[in-house]
């Protein structure tokens, strides 16, 4: 079983007191997601982020949450890599080989689905890299833990 580097294992860390509990902050450069606990503490998780030019930036909210989500490539993904994504255009049921992994939190802005997600991955070796089509990937065990903590409506801010 693959072990992520120790710096990407979830860890409680100190943060500024001003960060409200229950919010998520993602810093793409060092590949970290912070779930704010309040009182100057957060849980820091290692993540994979979008490849150059594909990152989500700014603020959103968790619009919905799904266990073992189904997946369908976006039209932009199919156009960018037709040989890879074309055969999957009709989508894929949830399960251990699904690109969204064990859980997905769907990011919404202004009441609309952005098509970006915080989700698990069947490829944990990608954590710490900028390789996705823009989503925030987490180790399945880590995203399951975060999913249990985060309510629909939680604010998410991504800094690049």
Model-derived regions: residue spans:
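Exported/periplasmic cell-wall-interacting domains
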Residues: 19, 51-59, 69, 80-160
């Amino acid at each position: 079983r693959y072990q992520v580097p120790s710096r990407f294992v979830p860890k409680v860390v100190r943060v500024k007191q001003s960060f409200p509990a229950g919010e998520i902050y993602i810093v793409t450069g060092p590949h970290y997601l912070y779930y704010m606990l309040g009182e100057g503490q957060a849980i820091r998780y290692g993540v994979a982020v979008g490849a150059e030019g594909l990152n989500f930036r700014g603020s959103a909210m968790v619009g919905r949450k799904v266990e073992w989500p189904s997946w369908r490539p976006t039209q932009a993904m199919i156009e960018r890599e037709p040989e890879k994504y074309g055969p999957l255009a009709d989508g894929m049921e949830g399960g251990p080989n699904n690109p969204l992994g064990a859980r997905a939190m769907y990011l919404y802005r202004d009441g609309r689905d952005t098509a970006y997600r915080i989700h698990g991955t069947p490829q944990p070796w990608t954590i710490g890299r900028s390789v996705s089509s823009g989503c925030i990937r987490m180790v399945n065990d880590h995203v399951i833990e975060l999913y249990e903590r985060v309510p629909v409506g939680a604010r998410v801010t991504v800094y690049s």
